[in-house]
Amino acid sequence: MEAFLGALEFQENEYEEFKELYESLKTKQKPHTLFISCVDSRVVPNLITGTQPGELYVIRNMGNVIPPKTSYKESLSTIASVEYAIAHVGVQNLIICGHSDCGACGSIHLIHDETTKAKTPYIANWIQFLEPIKEELKNHPQFSNHFAKRSWLTERLNARLQLNNLLSYDFIQERVINNELKIFGWHYIIETGRIYNYNFESHFFEPIEETIKQRISHENF
């Protein structure tokens, strides 16, 4: 019922604040960024990016997953939406946004017995996209008994995995090489509002203010 009351409030009051904007969006959209995030209710793309309607093209699924090219048929709607945003809508930026306390990432540390898989077969099948992270985690045994650090590491490895999966598609890789598309990997910390951006050169996640400074200094933002 809360959603209905909220919709009524929007319709009768909040819409008026953006009336001209919505009217301008009646027959066209020109978002500058494709934002791929988890379905988690605590991740609100327009809120954390300070954007208005029409600025973001949003794709959401459990774990902000992009299927690798070798498995694209297992999540055709996701990659088809990515292709549409890039090839037809013409976005110039693409952000993969992971987040803290991610249930999808946390699930790879749990034991998935056959009973659990039988109860939630679709979830079990989807989580298989995150399997490569398990191998990478073996390189960081120091975090195996530290829940918080292991969680952050898993979430960041996942964001990096999805960036690599994106680049397995020719139509994305070509645009990145030709500087027609910029791709970013974010890790959003829910309880603090902090966002960390993946640095492709250092292979570390850095506070976004550092990324902004670097890109402004290189006039590449």
Swiss-Prot record:
The family classification in the record reads: Belongs to the beta-class carbonic anhydrase family.
The transmembrane segments are none
Cofactor note text: Binds 1 zinc ion per subunit.
Biological processes annotated in GO: carbon utilization
- Which positions are annotated as binding Zn(2+)? 38, 40, 99, 102
Instruction: State the Pfam families in the record.
Output: Pro_CA (PF00484)
Q: What is its EC number?
A: 4.2.1.1
Answer whether the UniProt record assigns the keyword Oxidoreductase to this protein. no
Please give the cofactor(s) recorded in the UniProt entry for this protein. Answer: Zn(2+)
Organism, scientific name: Helicobacter pylori (strain J99 / ATCC 700824)
The Swiss-Prot or TrEMBL record annotates one GO molecular function as:
zinc ion binding
In its UniProt entry, what is this protein called?
Carbonic anhydrase
Give the UniProt keywords, A-Z.
Answer: Lyase, Metal-binding, Zinc
